[in-house]
């Protein structure tokens, strides 16, 4: 394996939104999207970068959306939590097909399917070059997978949270709706709060801020974007 001395990050926590997995579909998992992401991850693994992964559930069921439709919010969030396990298992299976050693750890017990999360075990797996996929969010309703990503990032002592989305970074407004939206290359934690930018929910963002954990938001669909970030290129938006 090649040395990673020329890379600025040694251990990363990659957060991928569920919407990224659905690709061109309106619902579900697009296998081609999964394969593309796995190839991006495999590229950085070849240089010794350790990768923890959290996947959202928006391609299947989002708790907040179900709640708006009349489903009890706690039940809605439980459905979202289970959906992250589905996404995580699909990701692991594609990783297996690319000969990438990976492990799914769930915040809730799912005996016979995946191991229950333990941070010491997770760090040991990462140190042995396994991709650790953290499923089931925080294990509790009312918390997003962004909160789970920041929490796991802190626990495993990751160097940075990399939030892979379908846009190039953080904008003043939704760039798909507003052509005049301003793109931000760098922001402070204070900037994000003052400008009320939708980077993450406040609980997740506060976790990262309080532990001085930098966040970079980038377009995971851009080829080699993940590689460029760990190499030190100024891809997307950096928040610190």
Curated annotation (Swiss-Prot):
Q: Does the keyword Transferase apply?
A: yes
Annotated keywords: ATP-binding, Cytoplasm, Kinase, Nucleotide-binding, Pyrimidine biosynthesis, Transferase
Show the GO cellular component annotation of the record.
cytosol
How does its record describe regulation of its activity?
Answer: Inhibited by UTP.
> Where is the protein found, in the record's own terms?
Cytoplasm
Residues at which ATP binds? 15-18, 58, 62, 165, 171, 174
Q: Which residues bind UMP?
A: 77, 138-145
Pathway(s) served:
Pyrimidine metabolism; CTP biosynthesis via de novo pathway; UDP from UMP (UMPK route): step 1/1
Q: What is its EC number?
A: 2.7.4.22
Which reaction does this enzyme catalyse, per its entry?
Answer: UMP + ATP = UDP + ADP
Keyword Transferase recorded: yes
Its chief place of residence is: cytoplasm
Which InterPro entries does the protein's record reference? AceGlu_kinase-like_sf, Asp/Glu/Uridylate_kinase, Uridylate_kinase, Uridylate_kinase_bac
Q: Which GO terms describe its biological process?
A: 'de novo' CTP biosynthetic process; UDP biosynthetic process
Any one Gene Ontology molecular-function term assigned to this protein's record: ATP binding
Give the transmembrane ranges. none
What the entry lists under NCBIfam families is as follows:
pyrH_bact
This molecule's function is given as:
Catalyzes the reversible phosphorylation of UMP to UDP.
Give the family, as the similarity comment puts it: Belongs to the UMP kinase family.
Its quaternary organisation is: Homohexamer.
Q: What is this protein called in UniProt?
A: Uridylate kinase
The organism named in the record is: Buchnera aphidicola subsp. Schizaphis graminum (strain Sg)
- Encoding gene (name): pyrH
């Amino acid at each position: 394996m090649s040395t990673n001395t020329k890379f600025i990050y040694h251990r990363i926590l990659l957060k991928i939104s569920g919407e990224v997995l659905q690709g061109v579909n309106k619902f579900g998992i697009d296998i081609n999207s999964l394969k593309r992401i796995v190839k991006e991850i495999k590229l950085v693994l070849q240089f010794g970068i350790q990768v923890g992964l959290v996947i959202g559930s928006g391609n299947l069921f989002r708790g907040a959306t179900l709640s708006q439709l009349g489903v009890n919010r706690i039940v809605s969030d439980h459905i979202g939590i289970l959906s992250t396990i589905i996404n995580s298992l699909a990701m692991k299976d594609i990783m297996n097909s690319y000969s990438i050693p990976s492990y799914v750890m769930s915040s809730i017990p799912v005996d016979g399917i995946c191991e229950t999360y333990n941070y010491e075990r997770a760090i040991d797996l990462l140190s042995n070059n396994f991709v650790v996929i953290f499923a089931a969010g925080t294990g509790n309703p009312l918390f997003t997978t962004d909160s789970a990503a920041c929490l796991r990032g802190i626990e495993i002592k990751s160097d940075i949270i990399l939030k892979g989305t379908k846009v190039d970074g953080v904008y003043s407004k939704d760039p798909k709706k507003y052509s005049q939206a301003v793109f931000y290359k760098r922001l402070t934690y204070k900037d994000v709060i003052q400008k009320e930018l939708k980077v993450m929910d406040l609980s997740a963002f506060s976790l990262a801020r309080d532990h001085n954990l930098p966040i970079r938001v980038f377009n995971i669909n851009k080829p080699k974007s993940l590689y460029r970030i760990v190499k030190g290129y100024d891809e997307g938006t950096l928040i610190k």
